[in-house]
Swiss-Prot record:
Disulfide bonds: none annotated. Belongs to the ATPase alpha/beta chains family. One of its GO terms (cellular component) is mitochondrion. One of its GO terms (molecular function) is ATP hydrolysis activity. The lineage of its organism: Eukaryota, Viridiplantae, Streptophyta, Embryophyta, Tracheophyta. Produces ATP from ADP in the presence of a proton gradient across the membrane. The catalytic sites are hosted primarily by the beta subunits. This is ATP synthase subunit beta, chloroplastic.
């Protein structure tokens, strides 16, 4: 693990004397800087522009070197707004990539891409910092153990279980519940596993970032009274920020997570919301740097950029990083290059369906489209595997029969098919679940359902033991015992009405 101690003022002044450039051109967030011969910075070095604008306001802009153009000129991308910069301003080469604070001091705090706190809670201890650009762990350091990561969410644990120390994608269009599902996972993992999480808000709404922070304070994931006892560090590079910040904020969050894994030897959860915005920011930067676009206007380096981020997210012999990434799917098209490139790196996919959301079934996880490499009998056990396969078969048969039902009606089906449809509708409703983070909207208390309880519940539905209970008893409940209790309440209500 490379640790950069903070440099003293005298060290910075010698760097200033040695490597001082001047701005030659500014095009939006892209700067061309001229350096003296033999004093050129390396690719990915951080450059700092300090000075005053025309209104005598202090300017402090950090940039990252992206291209060496020749004639002692480099092209750099700014990590913050370039308002007020002028040609001829002095630029300092720091001589190293961007470095951010790491370790326990980051917990309970909100940072920007540069690792600066933005929550008005005072400075952060920066004695231990780490560069955001690092190579992935060597093969010999990797850990290949297979173990399931229980989330307490029925549809996920049963049909597309997550693997500890690997990558999971949440796929869905706009407004189907990706961010709510991520918030629920952070809540469940902090409470059930007591694990440390790092949340990277990449190019998403500032309002959602604020909501998430408030939600975490309410649920105790962030401990306001004793910040050091918090379970999460937050790194935000939101929609309103320049593409350079949105492109690098994922690496800042990952660097903080890597320290917990490699030095503290912990199991860490890294949430990225949204990985598509990382690709989108890379596309903007690529166009600004003058690269020829590839398919659908994306950058030609799409696979390389994605790989350099994803390959660092892994399990080592010291600890693990389990990453859950929301993936916005443009126009619900899974063949778009951005989601398609992301798919290649994932061990499990949780696909959110607009059709289920329209029916009011939340989480709107599509049980047939969601997949996991963990759903194999020799990993999860025969009982879990058999139950999951029978649930999928029942739902698939229901899907096949829907056209016949729409044209001819239920009465035209055979007795066996009618029973399959009835059970499939109960399964569909039982896959819904009240969330802790949605209590304020639904009024229903959240439920955490263990894997053994989940399997038992679906086995009872498939066996036909619950055929006599009404469909609505299965909707938005936790375990199967709550279904029978809800059915009794519904029966009492209907008797009172009579």
């Amino acid at each position: 693990m490379r640790i950069n101690p903070t440099t003293s003022g005298s060290a910075v002044s010698t760097v200033e004397e040695k490597k001082l450039g001047r701005i030659a051109q500014i095009i939006g967030p892209v700067l061309d800087v001229v350096f003296p011969p033999g004093k050129m910075p390396n690719i990915y070095n951080a450059l700092v522009v300090k000075g005053r604008d025309t209104a005598s306001q202090q300017i402090n802009v950090t940039c990252e070197v992206q291209q060496l153009l020749g004639n002692n000129r480099v092209r750099a991308v700014a990590m913050s707004a370039t308002d007020g910069l002028t040609r001829g301003m002095e630029v300092i080469d720091t001589g190293a990539p961007l470095s951010v604070p790491v370790g326990g001091a980051t917990l309970g705090r909100i940072f920007n891409v540069l690792g600066e706190p933005v929550d008005n809670l005072g400075p952060v201890d920066t004695r231990t910092t780490s560069p955001i650009h690092r190579s992935a762990p060597a093969f010999i350091q990797l850990d290949t153990k297979l173990s399931i990561f229980e989330t307490g969410i029925k549809v996920v644990d049963l049909l597309a279980p997550y693997r500890r120390g690997r990558k999971i994608g949440l796929f869905g269009g706009a407004g189907v519940g990706k961010t709510v599902l991520i918030m629920e996972l952070i809540n469940n993992i902090a409470k059930a596993h007591g694990g440390v999480s790092v949340f990277g808000g990449v190019g998403e709404r500032t309002r959602e970032g604020n909501d998430l922070y408030m939600e975490m304070k309410e649920s105790g994931v962030i401990n306001e009274k004793n910040i050091a006892e918090s379970k999460v560090a937050l790194v935000y590079g939101q929609m309103n920020e320049p593409p350079g910040a949105r492109m690098r904020v994922g690496l800042t969050a990952l660097t903080m997570a890597e320290y917990f894994r490699d030095v503290n030897e912990q199991d860490v959860l890294l949430f990225i919301d949204n990985i598509f915005r990382f690709v989108q920011a890379g596309s903007e930067v690529s166009a600004l740097l003058g690269r020829m676009p590839s398919a659908v206007g994306y950058q030609p380096t799409l696979s390389t950029e994605m790989g350099s981020l994803q390959e660092r997210i892994t399990s080592t012999k010291e600890g693990s990083i389990t990453s859950i990434q929301a993936v916005y799917v443009p126009a619900d098209d899974l063949t778009d290059p951005a989601p398609a490139t992301t798919f290649a790196h994932l061990d499990a996919t949780t696909v959110l369906s607009r059709g289920l959301a329209a029916k009011g079934i939340y989480p709107a996880v599509d049980p047939l489209d969601s997949t996991s490499t963990m759903l194999q009998p020799w990993i999860v056990g025969e009982e879990h595997y058999e139950t999951a396969q029978r649930v999928k078969q029942t739902l698939q048969r229901y899907k096949e029969l829907q056209d016949i039902i729409a044209i001819l009606g239920l009465d035209e089906l055979s007795e066996e098919d009618r029973l399959t449809v009835a059970r499939a509708r109960k399964i569909e409703r039982f896959l819904s679940q009240p969330f802790f983070v949605a209590e304020v909207f639904t009024g229903s208390p959240g439920k955490y359902v263990g894997l053994a309880e989940t399997i038992r519940g679906f086995q009872l539905i498939l066996s036909g033991e619950l055929d006599g209970l009404p469909e609505q008893a299965f909707y938005l409940v936790g375990n199967i015992d709550e279904v029978t209790a809800k059915a009794m309440n519904l029966e009492k209500e209907s008797n009172l009405k009579k």
